[in-house]
Amino acid sequence: MKICIVGPSGAGKTTIAKKLAEELKISTHAFDEIYWNLSGTEFVKNSEETISVGIKQIILQDSWIVEGAYDKRLLPLLLECSIILKMEVPLYLRTIRLLQRYLKSLVTGKRPKETLKNTIELIQFSHRFDKRLEKFLSSNTQLSRKVISFNNFSKAINAIQTGFKNNLPDSLIHNERTKKG
């Protein structure tokens, strides 16, 4: 099973991905860990080559969960996955979570450092995100037919359990069963 979880910053993608990975006994990957070099004190974008290699390494695995905010570099993963879980969380809640993340990073000294400027930029990005993602997913029929929207863990589990029966085209269901043997 290959699952992509997409949603804006502060939606809870990482939390949901970890719970799903535990429930389904498969690996999880944060796109931020591919996109950003997280070894320093500041956020620095990885090279296109490093990002591409990271994506290819994930695609080669039999099953995975990848979570991230939409970026054009995610496209190979979105095309490869069996199901796209789209998180829908109100902007006010995402804003609260992003501010909590910033305050927690101040207390814990987490690296790379979350700055107030970065946090404000994330809130602004989160505000614009929904329309951009909807436009992107709806413009590609190969992707739009895989999308199931949800807003909490139990709905995500239910979407996965029923997705292959009710929400995905027969061709995808057949491909998923064929891959399993």
Predicted regions and their residues:
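The conserved Walker
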Residues: S9
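Conserved lysine of the Walker
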Residues: K13
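Conserved substrate/cofactor phosphate-moiety recognition/catalytic segment
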Residues: K18, E22-D62
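Short, well-ordered alpha-helix to beta-strand connector turns
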Residues: Q61-D62, C81-S82, S144
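NTP-dependent small-molecule kinase module
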Residues: F125-G181
